[in-house]
């Protein structure tokens, strides 16, 4: 057990800090040496032990052996590249496709400047940023799912 310091609520300085919403870390158990020397190494060693144990108990093959004479009909990238792959696949002009791919990080960089993020951290008080995030998430999922389908069904996801 560590040393637990109870707050003195009669202290006017602490009362002023608590009234402003500050001072919540003014008391409690210290991080040094309790957390840094005892808890963190146990968690890190436990994580390493779990990974090694799973690797020993259930070794898995990396994949099929490569066959240079058997090429799949359609080569798909890794799952995290599906939305970008779908953009390049559906846009007929490749320069426009590259510009659309560049516009994604550019748009993400402009989101903090649309609203004053430092003022509020609650997403319900930042409706523009929240709406852009939700629309971007839906579009990324739509493009990602569409990339796994044939090109004829990819834009409508086979629904229409």
UniProtKB/Swiss-Prot annotation:
One Pfam family hit: Cytochrom_B_C
Question: Which InterPro entries does the entry link to?
Answer: Cyt_b/b6_C, Cyt_b/b6_C_sf, Cyt_b6/f_cplx_suIV, Cytochrome_b_C_euk/bac
Q: Name one GO molecular function term.
A: electron transporter, transferring electrons within the cyclic electron transport pathway of photosynthesis activity
Membrane topology category: Multi-pass membrane protein
UniProt cross-references to SUPFAM superfamilies, sorted A to Z: a domain/subunit of cytochrome bc1 complex (Ubiquinol-cytochrome c reductase)
Question: GO cellular-component terms in the record?
Answer: chloroplast thylakoid membrane
Q: Which domain of life is it from?
A: Eukaryota
Question: Keyword set for this entry?
Answer: Chloroplast, Electron transport, Membrane, Photosynthesis, Plastid, Thylakoid, Transmembrane, Transmembrane helix, Transport
Q: Does the keyword Aminoacyl-tRNA synthetase apply?
A: no
- Which stretches are transmembrane? 36-56, 95-115, 131-151
Q: What does this protein do?
A: Component of the cytochrome b6-f complex, which mediates electron transfer between photosystem II (PSII) and photosystem I (PSI), cyclic electron flow around PSI, and state transitions.
Q: How does it assemble?
A: The 4 large subunits of the cytochrome b6-f complex are cytochrome b6, subunit IV (17 kDa polypeptide, petD), cytochrome f and the Rieske protein, while the 4 small subunits are petG, petL, petM and petN. The complex functions as a dimer.
Q: Family assignment?
A: Belongs to the cytochrome b family. PetD subfamily.
HAMAP family associated with the record: Cytb6_f_subIV
Official protein name in the record? Cytochrome b6-f complex subunit 4
Organism this protein belongs to = Glycine max (Soybean)
